[in-house]
């Protein structure tokens, strides 16, 4: 089940914070940042739940005409089951931007499969280890 978080979803926010530390290590969002994304008018978080457990999540910044994916992740035991795809499909209503570590080939291939195109590189964007970010964009045809 996919759910859009509200500030009352304290347990899910805590789960996301813990997953962020496990998955993204030093580049993880803080608990406060995660809570702020839920509270703000221009951002939101979707979670994919199985038996009240967060198995995947999508953090999005909602600009007027585009979305920016801040984070998308699936826990290890739930990978390759289409969870990230279902989460991404929820926001394919306007153009989407994201950045991804250049070494994260699995994610890059996932994005390419979803019609994201590389548009730029940010040199040295990530730390621990220092690494370039690939900026990607998916355009939605609203004809």
Which role does the model predict for each range below?
Residues 54, 118-120:
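Residue-level detector of beta-propeller blades
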Residues 69, 96-100:
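Conserved hydrophobic beta-strand within the GNAT/NAT acetyltransferase core sheet
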Residues 74-76, 80-93, 105-113:
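Conserved acetyl-CoA-binding loop-helix of GNAT-fold acetyltransferases
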Residues 101-105, 124-143:
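C-terminal "cap" of GNAT-fold acetyltransferases
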Residues 6-77, 85-90, 140-141:
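Acetyl-CoA-dependent GNAT
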Residues 20, 111, 116, 136:
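Conserved active-site tyrosine of GNAT-family acetyltransferases
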Residues 1-2:
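Extreme N-terminal starter segment of soluble prokaryotic enzymes
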């Amino acid at each position: 089940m996919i759910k859009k978080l509200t500030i009352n979803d304290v347990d899910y926010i805590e789960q996301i914070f813990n997953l962020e530390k496990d998955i993204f290590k030093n580049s993880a969002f803080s608990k406060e940042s995660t809570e702020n994304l839920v509270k703000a008018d221009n951002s939101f978080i979707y979670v994919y739940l199985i038996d009240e457990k967060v198995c995947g999540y999508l953090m999005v910044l909602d600009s007027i005409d585009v979305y920016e994916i801040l984070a998308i992740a699936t826990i290890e035991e739930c990978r390759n089951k289409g969870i990230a795809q279902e989460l991404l499909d929820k926001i394919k209503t306007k153009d989407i931007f994201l950045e991804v570590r250049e070494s994260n080939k699995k994610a890059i291939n996932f994005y390419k499969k979803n019609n994201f195109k590389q548009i730029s590189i940010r040199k040295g964007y990530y730390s621990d280890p220092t690494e370039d970010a690939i900026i990607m964009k998916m355009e939605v045809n609203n004809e």
